[in-house]
């Protein structure tokens, strides 16, 4: 019997012009940053269903941020908007001149969430950080984060700095979708087993359409803590370039005297990246190991997937 889809309601909210639709279009609709300039303002609520990892469907509510719409969300549409929410993503324009009003609307959202979906996870994105002078970004973000955490009580919120012009958008959205994957701990355990079996330094699992990182394993600390989202951004751009040439991205191998890295189609919904610090291991051996693990990870993607882990045969 085929698995039924598991729908997760995600609210995307924030003042008009804060950049909600632009980031949604980049992550889920394959826009590049410069093309988002032609997007118009969202009218009321735009619904979209994004299939993610096969059975998981993100029911994304992109809520227009004009004052009239915002007031309606908290009055006549309150129950409809805020009922059965899994995740609230609130986007703040870091250069907004109406910060007090932004915070007021955010707190109104939290009150409605507490009443209708008290278990929802809250994410705050301090957006358009590219407009802030580089030497001021850490300080400004830290101040905003402290304010948002204080205003969010008794709820917890996770804060991210974001920009459509760099990899920070992928870091934030990878963290968000990670919270929505039902069997993520089982996935991570099997990814760790897989990495240890093939003697890999790192293994990353990317969602196939968005190239968001959904799981990873590393056996030792690496110098660049932002490398995952950088890879997401680079490969997503490369995939889009391939599409413009009527070609599809299949796989990639990068190798030098210190390491070998492989990116390959893994399951019907994922790509895998394997990093080996022993470049003497033949490429063919690693690619065979990836191929042999595919069937097992295909089963894991189902909500009712197997409870056993990947072990050496």
UniProtKB/Swiss-Prot annotation:
There is a cross-link at residues 142, 220, 230, 244 (Glycyl lysine isopeptide (Lys-Gly) (interchain with G-Cter in ubiquitin)). This is Ras-related GTP-binding protein A. InterPro entries: Gtr1_RagA (IPR006762), P-loop_NTPase (IPR027417), RagA/B (IPR039397). It catalyses: GTP + H2O = GDP + phosphate + H(+). PANTHER family: RAS-RELATED GTP BINDING RAG/GTR YEAST (PTHR11259), RAS-RELATED GTP-BINDING PROTEIN A (PTHR11259:SF7). Its EC number is 3.6.5.-. SUPFAM superfamilies: P-loop containing nucleoside triphosphate hydrolases. One of its GO terms (molecular function) is protein homodimerization activity. It is an enzyme of class 3 (hydrolase). Changing residue 71 to A: Abolished interaction with TFE3 and TFEB without affecting interaction with RPTOR. GTP binds at residues 16-17, 19-22, 36, 42, 65, 127, 164. Belongs to the GTR/RAG GTP-binding protein family. Can occur as a homodimer or as a heterodimer with RRAGC or RRAGD in a sequence-independent manner; heterodimerization stabilizes proteins of the heterodimer. The GTP-bound form of RRAGA (in complex with the GDP-bound form of RRAGC or RRAGD) interacts with RPTOR, thereby promoting recruitment of mTORC1 to the lysosomes. The Rag heterodimer interacts with SLC38A9; the probable amino acid sensor. The Rag heterodimer interacts with the Ragulator complex. The GTP-bound form of RRAGA interacts with NOL8. It is found in: Cytoplasm; Nucleus; Lysosome membrane. It comes from Homo sapiens (Human). Polybiquitinated via 'Lys-63'-linked polyubiquitination by RNF152 in response to amino acid starvation: polyubiquitination of the GDP-bound inactive form by RNF152 promotes RRAGA inactivation and interaction with the GATOR1 complex. This does not affect RRAGA degradation. Guanine nucleotide-binding protein that plays a crucial role in the cellular response to amino acid availability through regulation of the mTORC1 signaling cascade. Forms heterodimeric Rag complexes with RagC/RRAGC or RagD/RRAGD and cycles between an inactive GDP-bound and an active GTP-bound form: RagA/RRAGA is in its active form when GTP-bound RagA/RRAGA forms a complex with GDP-bound RagC/RRAGC (or RagD/RRAGD) and in an inactive form when GDP-bound RagA/RRAGA heterodimerizes with GTP-bound RagC/RRAGC (or RagD/RRAGD). (Microbial infection) May alternatively act as a cellular target for adenovirus E3-14.7K, an inhibitor of TNF-alpha functions, thereby affecting cell death. Changing residue 35 to A: In RA2 mutant; abolished interaction with RPTOR without affecting GTP-binding. Does not affect interaction with TFE3 and TFEB.
């Amino acid at each position: 019997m085929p698995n039924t889809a598991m729908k997760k309601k995600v609210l995307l909210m924030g003042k008009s012009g804060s950049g909600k639709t632009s980031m949604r279009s980049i992550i889920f609709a394959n826009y590049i940053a410069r093309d988002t300039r032609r997007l118009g303002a969202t009218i009321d609520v735009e619904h979209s269903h994004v299939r993610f990892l096969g059975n998981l469907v993100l029911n994304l509510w992109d809520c227009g941020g004009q004052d009239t719409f915002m007031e309606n969300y908290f009055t006549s549409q309150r129950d409809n908007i805020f009922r059965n929410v899994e995740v609230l993503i609130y986007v703040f324009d870091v250069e907004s001149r109406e910060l007090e009003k932004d915070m007021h609307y955010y707190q109104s959202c939290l009150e409605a969430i507490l009443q209708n979906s008290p278990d929802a996870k809250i994410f705050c994105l301090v957006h358009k950080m590219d407009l802030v002078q580089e030497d001021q970004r850490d300080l400004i973000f830290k101040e905003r984060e402290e304010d948002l955490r204080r205003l969010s009580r008794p709820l917890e919120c996770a804060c991210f700095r974001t920009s459509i012009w760099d990899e920070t958008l992928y870091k934030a959205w990878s963290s968000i979708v990670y919270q929505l994957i039902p069997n993520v701990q089982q996935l991570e355990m099997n990814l760790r087993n897989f990495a240890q079996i093939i003697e890999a330094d790192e293994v990353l699992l990317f969602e196939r359409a968005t190239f968001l990182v959904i799981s990873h394993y590393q056996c030792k600390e690496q110098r660049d803590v932002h490398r995952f989202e950088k890879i997401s951004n680079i490969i997503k751009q490369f995939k889009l370039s391939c599409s413009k040439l009527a070609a599809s991205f299949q796989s990639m191998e990068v190798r030098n005297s210190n390491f070998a890295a492989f990116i390959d189609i893994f399951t019907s919904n994922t790509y895998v990246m394997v990093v080996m610090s022993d470049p003497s291991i033949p490429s063919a051996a690693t690619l065979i190991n990836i191929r042999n693990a595919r069937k097992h990870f295909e089963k894991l993607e189902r909500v009712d997937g197997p409870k056993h882990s990947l072990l050496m045969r």
